[in-house]
Amino acid sequence: MMVMNTELRQDTPQFKRWEAVPQPLDFKVYIFNVTNPYEVQMGRRPRVVEVGPYVYFQYRHKDNIRFSRDRSKVHFSQQQMYVFDAESSYPLTENDQLTVLNMHMNSILQIIDTQAKETITNFRSDVNNTLEKIPVVRVIKRIIEKTTPIQSILQLAEDETYDSLRLINAELNRIFGRPDSMFLRTTPREFLFEGVPFCVNVIGIAKAICKEIEKRNTKTIRVQPDGSMKFSFFNHKNMTNDGTYTINTGIKEPALTQMIEYWNGRNTLDRWINQSAGSSSKCNKIVGTDGSGYPPFREGVERMTIFSSDICRTVDIKYVGPSSYEGIPALRFETDSHFLNEIGPEYGNDCYCVNRIPKAIVKNNGCLYKGALDLSTCFDAPVVLTHPHMMGAAQEYTSLIDGLYPDPEKHQIFVDVEPLTGTPLNGGKRVQFNMFLRRIDSIRLTDRLQTTLFPVLWIEEGIALNEDMVKLIDDSLMKVLTLLDIVQWVMIGSGLLLAIIMPIVYFIKRRPSSGSITPTLTTTTSTVSISDGGGLGGNPQK
């Protein structure tokens, strides 16, 4: 019965709860407000202040559900929707004014810095093609080419990255709206979901650069109907799904319940380094559940695995001890040091060392220092993952910024799991997103910057079962277990009582009556006394 209550069988209460999470998850965002942006521009140490949480309801609903023929697998996608929770966020609002790192400008500049020749060649080609369509320009261009055959009208030292970046530097004001620093004054509404506009009413070279940005198809940037663009950190997650999952229903093998078989039709990723062509490294393996549920009977399990599409990787969580939630016994699991603190060839997982952020603060082997993970290949942007407030990160990063206060109670990833059903009772996925801020040759705004791993925001995505769900588990599981516990002790007590009564009954049934014993005993005694001649009394009578 316990196993059947954890299997994913259609038209059962368990299936309905799996299909639509019966309560919204909490999605909390903490943004790092920069208090000295202009000092940072001058090369000083940044100071940040955490502002949050900005709380959102996260609703999840599975659709496109299809079962395999033998019902052992189920395919689905999961829609997500975010709604601002003004009450839980109070006194903070989505319209608060904050100063944050200008992520999209910083990202675009770093990408152009590393791919300048390719980018410049592409947008020069676009501009040339556009000009060729204008008759007057075409005639003038032909005349210039005849007098200067080595260079066309737009050939500006094509092989020189330096000159290419100078060209881009001249267009920054048109693309990003006259920025006076690498920081942005914005609101949580714009920065997180609605979008920060850029590439508005651009022409010429600026328009060509914006076209190159559009071609990258970065998920945090959306093209608007008028051709302009908007950057937002989480809008790509809103009213969308993160792909198609195929998971085990547990009908044939309960120990595999909710374990992922395929994601988008594959059991491997292509985001991390593979040791050889045609092979897949362990960094690219898709293993575990999606974290919304686990197989039953977790007692004695030392380690579990979660696949997170948000960070394009599998994460191990280890058992750290017993716990409880609202009176329900649980097992607590947390991420271990392999998640962020032990990455590199010495740990056998250097496939995570993608080394895609030039001029970053890295070890000699190209890996980031302890506590940081390069997500460039996951985000298609130079984003770095850490624990909140860079908890556990190397001093090469933490010593360069003021305002970080790591606290395991607030910042550790954890989940409390009910051991018999594998149900998560309470938990939080807590991660921080950062970017390297550094000098880029020929970009004036970056001239005096010191290379720093700069915190942008951290999130806590989690669940704490509400009263209704706690009551459901208490009624359907804990009271049954309590009843079974009572029955067990009644049976033990009954057994002990029987163990005491049965020998007594047996002894009574086996014991002879008193009338049959006395004559025999008397006769025997008299006979012995006479023959011994006085062993028990005086001399025999004469």
UniProtKB/Swiss-Prot annotation:
Q: Its principal location?
A: membrane
Keyword field contains Phosphoprotein: no
Q: Name one GO biological process term.
A: sensory perception of smell
Which keywords belong to this entry?
Answer: Cell membrane, Disulfide bond, Glycoprotein, Membrane, Olfaction, Receptor, Sensory transduction, Transmembrane, Transmembrane helix
One GO MF term on file is: scavenger receptor activity
Q: Where in the cell is it found?
A: Cell membrane
Q: Which cysteines are joined by disulfide bonds?
A: C283-C351, C312-C378, C353-C367
Extracellular topological domain residue ranges: 1-487
Where would you find the membrane-spanning parts of this chain? 488-508
Q: Name one Pfam family in it.
A: CD36
| Membrane topology field | Single-pass membrane protein
UniProt entry tagged with the keyword Transmembrane helix? yes
Summarize tissue expression: Detected in the antenna, legs and wings. Higher levels of expression detected in male compared to female.
Source organism superkingdom: Eukaryota
Q: Which family does it belong to?
A: Belongs to the CD36 family.
Q: What does this protein do?
A: Plays an olfactory role that is not restricted to pheromone sensitivity.
Name of the protein in its database record:
Sensory neuron membrane protein 2
Species of origin reads Aedes aegypti (Yellowfever mosquito)
